[in-house]
Amino acid sequence: MLAALIPVSPLSNVKSRLKEFLSSKERIDLIKNILLDTYEKVKSCVDACYVVSKDDEILEFSKNLGIIPIKEDLNTKGLNEAIEYSLNIIKEDSVLITPADVPLLKEENLESIVKKSVENSVIICPSRGGGTNLLLLNPKNCIKPQFEGFSFLKHIKEAEINNLNIIKCHSFYTSIDINTVEDLGEIFIHGKDTKTYKFLKNLNIEAFPKHSSAGRFNIIRKSQ
């Protein structure tokens, strides 16, 4: 059986690189909308979906969606320890891990990825910056999670050390995560069917092409 695990940082620290553009409440609402989009895409591909966080608000929000909440132990430090803690609670044999900032996941991509999974394998989907935006472990404890930094290469190395079958899946939609204001532009181009897009539109945010080599988009917020 396959579970999905979505780690979420405490909402007090969420998406700090957007703080000059979005208020604290807006950043919290943004991550909730991305989480909702993520859950709607993964739920049909897995047997159960979990969220791990230290944040009671996000755990309650997740529970109301039908996601199983895991309250991080107070002694866990960082993302990787939170994931390891969760893997010892999750009852399913294998697990698909994806961060809560990947709003463009497509159900058809996930179905294709899940079908590739075999026993003693690791499926890795990189982010644009060399991180990992999706990691499918079969079985769930076959490697130690190595998120943060150039985690794509770290996960490959960890899988090689453990003599596992390594399956690399390069997908544009899976590679997009939201960390900066400019990243929001990808949602306006590729995510018009998402709740995240509707949320941003309701804030009167618009994206325009940038006609220079300095970036991809101009993201503006119209006065109401």
Swiss-Prot record:
Gene Ontology MF term list: GTP binding; phospholactate guanylyltransferase activity
InterPro entries documented for this protein: CofC, Nucleotide-diphossugar_trans
UniProt-listed Gene3D superfamilies: Spore Coat Polysaccharide Biosynthesis Protein SpsA, Chain A (3.90.550.10)
Statement: the UniProt record of this protein carries the keyword Transferase: yes
Record GO biological process: F420-0 metabolic process
Known catalytic reactions: (2S)-2-phospholactate + GTP + H(+) = (2S)-lactyl-2-diphospho-5'-guanosine + diphosphate
Pathway of action: Cofactor biosynthesis; coenzyme F420 biosynthesis
Broad class of enzyme this protein falls into: transferase
Record carries keyword Nucleotidyltransferase: yes
The enzyme's E.C. designation: 2.7.7.68
Reported function: Guanylyltransferase that catalyzes the activation of (2S)-2-phospholactate (2-PL) as (2S)-lactyl-2-diphospho-5'-guanosine, via the condensation of 2-PL with GTP. It is involved in the biosynthesis of coenzyme F420, a hydride carrier cofactor.
Family: Belongs to the CofC family.
Protein name per its UniProtKB record: 2-phospho-L-lactate guanylyltransferase
Species for this entry: Methanococcus vannielii (strain ATCC 35089 / DSM 1224 / JCM 13029 / OCM 148 / SB)
Source lineage: Archaea, Methanobacteriati, Methanobacteriota, Methanomada group, Methanococci
Name of the gene: cofC
